[in-house]
């Protein structure tokens, strides 16, 4: 129910029209709050639709089709001299993104809340100054301004020139060779995309492994495939400087105690993103910011309780479904201060859309050890599984983590074919707090990829208490 009265223009002002902001506005409007959404970007849709999840996955799927066609002889199918039209690949991606963005624009302008195209800055804790010259007031705020590409660690890159995760998704032509700086999800996805479109790729990662937050057995599987597909990996390597050379660009690296120089036509800087909050005036009104991110509690409140922050601007988890959940929690709490909800990250999930796909939910072995959480783990390889052998998808494995005393499933990992789909069985199991005994007893159709989960479940069921 609206509580503005004569004091404020709106019950809730949402700054940012991406996934988190739209979720907050939709939830608030459904709860009867007078709501306004402010979007100051040149385009409407948010990172996921415009320059993140959707365009990258459209391109990655095209790369997968090209890879399968190029290896059709594995199934006895002749497909000689497989070629591609990169302009058509990009045109298909652009058409999809236009449709997705148009739909989001329609949702934002659908009349359930006010939608304004303007940048916003806090003049005081309850007032926003807009780039249009107007001002508006609100009882509560949700900041959902997303993230921007992080500044490069090598100052020379500004002069040399480089691609970012934003610009790499909109190239008119492919470079012949590419140096990828970074080893996180975006870096490895784009590295494999370009490599499968026959670009010579060198990937440079500071940590000992790509996807360094995950378990070493997980990242090792992906690195094995990358090397097999011709991607040159430099792990445990520090970039030192960059310069232009006659035939392209060169990066100096510190690798195994020596200086190594690698050259390519282009450099892709993919060392992450940072919260997009610099222009909001948060420090002036006392909103706590640490390490360039907005600090929130589990109710998504900032240090000023009537101001909430969700999504990438909090710097916690750059994952769309988390931003959506946070937006819904923030809006609910703005509407119902007497029965507030809080975020539960127990089912935190991440999927990396390489091939094999990498998907994790809950605890990894690394995070369980860091938290001193007792666990038992069991895994099973796709190289010994009937359906994956039929598909020639032999790389990777599934792994379960369980509480030793109760057998409750506390984590799952899938490195393998359609891992992003397969992990949802474990998400559902953990949502209902199932044990490995219950998962092992659940029927699985044969032959399917999903039945592979039964094997580690059965192994753990024999070891865990009930």
Protein language model features and the residues they cover:
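Glycine-rich flavin
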Residues: 2-10, 26-33, 39-174, 202, ...
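Short hydrophobic core segments
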Residues: 13-15, 120, 136-146, 180-181, ...
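Flexible, glycine-rich terminal cap/loop adjacent to redox cofactors
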Residues: 15-41, 47, 54, 58-65, ...
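Glycine-rich Rossmann-fold phosphate-binding loop(s) that bind the pyrophosphate
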Residues: 16-19, 42, 181-184, 312
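N-terminal Rossmann-fold NAD(P) dinucleotide-binding loop
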Residues: 21, 187-188
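Gly/Ala-rich phosphate-binding loop of Rossmann-like dinucleotide-binding domains
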Residues: 25, 29, 191-196
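FAD-binding beta-loop-beta segment adjacent to the flavin cofactor pocket
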Residues: 149, 286, 292-306, 365, ...
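FAD-site-proximal beta/loop scaffold in flavoenzymes
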Residues: 158-175, 261-337, 440
């Amino acid at each position: 129910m609206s509580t503005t009265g004569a004091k404020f223009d709106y019950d809730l002002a949402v700054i940012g029209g991406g996934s988190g902001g739209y979720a907050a506005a939709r939830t608030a409007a459904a709860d009867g709050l007078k709501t306004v959404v402010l979007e100051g970007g040149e385009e409407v849709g948010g990172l996921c639709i415009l320059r993140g999840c959707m365009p990258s996955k459209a391109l990655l799927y095209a790369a997968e089709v090209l890879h399968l066609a190029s290896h059709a002889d594995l199934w006895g199918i002749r497909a000689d001299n497989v070629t591609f039209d990169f302009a058509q690949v990009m045109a298909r991606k652009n058409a999809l993104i236009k449709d997705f963005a148009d739909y989001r624009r329609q949702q934002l302008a659908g009349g359930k809340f006010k939608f304004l195209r303007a940048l916003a800055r806090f003049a005081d804790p309850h007032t926003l100054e807009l780039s249009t010259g107007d001002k508006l007031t609100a009882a509560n705020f949700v900041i959902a301004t997303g993230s921007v590409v992080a500044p490069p660690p090598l100052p020379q890159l500004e002069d040399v020139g480089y691609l970012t995760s934003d610009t790499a998704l909109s190239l008119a032509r492919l470079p012949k060779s590419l140096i990828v700086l970074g080893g996180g999800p975006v870096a490895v996805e784009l590295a494999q995309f370009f490599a499968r479109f026959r670009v010579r790729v060198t990937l440079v990662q500071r940590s000992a492994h790509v996807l360094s937050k995950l378990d070493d057995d997980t990242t090792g599987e992906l690195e094995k495939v990358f090397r097999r597909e011709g991607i040159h990996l430099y792990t445990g390597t520090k970039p030192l400087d960059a310069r232009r050379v006659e035939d392209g660009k060169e990066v100096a690296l510190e690798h195994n105690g020596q200086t190594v120089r690698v050259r390519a036509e282009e450099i892709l800087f993919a060392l992450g993103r940072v919260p997009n909050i610099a222009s909001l005036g948060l420090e002036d009104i006392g909103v706590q910011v640490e390490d360039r991110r907005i600090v929130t509690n589990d109710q998504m409140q900032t240090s000023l309780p009537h101001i909430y922050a969700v999504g990438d601007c909090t710097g916690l988890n750059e994952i769309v479904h988390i931003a959506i959940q946070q937006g819904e929690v923030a809006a609910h709490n703005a509407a119902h201060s007497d029965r507030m909800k809080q975020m539960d990250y127990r089912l935190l999930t991440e999927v990396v859309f390489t091939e094999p796909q990498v998907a994790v939910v809950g605890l990894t072995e690394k995070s369980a050890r860091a938290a001193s959480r007792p666990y038992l783990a069991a895994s099973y390889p796709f190289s010994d599984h009937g359906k994956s052998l039929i598909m020639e998808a032999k790389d990777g494995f599934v792994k379960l983590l369980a509480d030793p005393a109760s057998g409750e499933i506390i984590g799952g990992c899938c490195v393998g074919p359609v891992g992003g789909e397969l992990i949802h069985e474990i998400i559902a199991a953990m949502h209902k707090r199932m044990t490995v005994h219950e998962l092992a007893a659940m029927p699985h159709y044969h032959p399917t990829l999903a039945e592979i989960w039964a094997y580690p479940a059965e192994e753990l069921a024999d070891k865990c208490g009930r």
